[in-house]
């Protein structure tokens, strides 16, 4: 899977929840290419999310929601996930 395919999957999952107003996905994998244990098949993703529903949750609740939503992708394609609420 490449980053474009993964981004499309993530967008679909987030927008299918009907609670996301804005989503930006940024591939930060290039920052880790020189690391000894870097796996090129797993991505370092930064998410910028705007969602009133997630804003009304605690930080722990909103992160749990996102990690449950992306469970399969976290296991198979994402090495690290940075979440910013805007």
Show the residue positions of the predicted features.
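N-terminal, polar/charged subdomain of small-to-medium soluble alpha/beta proteins
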Residues: 1-86
